[in-house]
Amino acid sequence: MAAFIAKQMVGNQLSAVKGAVGGDGGDDGDDKEKAEEEERERQEAIKEAEDRRKEKHRKMEEEREKMRQDIRDKYNIKKKEEIVEAAPQEEPNPLMRKKKTPEELAAEAEQEELDDFTKLKNQIETQVNELKTQIEGKCVMQ
């Protein structure tokens, strides 16, 4: 490892000295083109390696899932997803419930307010009707 690092350091310095001593000005354009081409090739190689890795991973997952399904079939085991779906229906957890947005809370408060208003209105109407019947009962017209 140390040899590699030393070689890189000395190699870079040696390249700089060669460029300064040689004085070739035309090579800079070629060097840039070569560097760009090498960078493109490197990026393509990285992409190909990543694609191969993903494909290998996908194949392994398919094989694992097939093996899991064979075991499930052999021992008559249901998939976990089916079991998980049945559990929340039995006993809802209040800590895991959906949180209400401020808009929902405002709508609920408005609904409660309307309910209170309706209750008060009905209460007042019943009291007025009771008073009306009491007054009519006391004042009998002949």
Curated annotation (Swiss-Prot):
Residue numbers bearing the Cysteine methyl ester modification: 139
Propeptide: 140-142
GO cellular component, one term: presynaptic active zone
SS bonds (residue pairs): none
Annotated GO biological process: modulation of chemical synaptic transmission; negative regulation of neurotransmitter secretion; neuromuscular synaptic transmission; regulation of neurotransmitter secretion; regulation of synaptic vesicle fusion to presynaptic active zone membrane; synaptic assembly at neuromuscular junction; synaptic vesicle exocytosis
Main location: membrane
Cited InterPro entries: Synaphin
Lipid anchor positions (S-farnesyl cysteine): 139
Region (Disordered) residue spans: 13-70, 83-105
Record keyword Heme present: no
Localisation per UniProt entry: Membrane
Membrane topology: Lipid-anchor
Biased composition (Basic and acidic residues): 31-70
Molecular function in Gene Ontology: SNARE binding; syntaxin binding
Coiled coil regions, renumbered to chain: 29-138
Keyword annotations: Coiled coil, Exocytosis, Lipoprotein, Membrane, Methylation, Neurotransmitter transport, Prenylation, Transport
Superkingdom field: Eukaryota
Family as reported in the entry's similarity comment: Belongs to the complexin/synaphin family.
Function per UniProt: Positively regulates a late step in synaptic vesicle exocytosis.
Subunit structure: Binds to the SNARE core complex containing Snap25, synaptobrevin and Syx1A.
The name this protein goes by in its record: Complexin
The organism of origin for this protein: Drosophila melanogaster
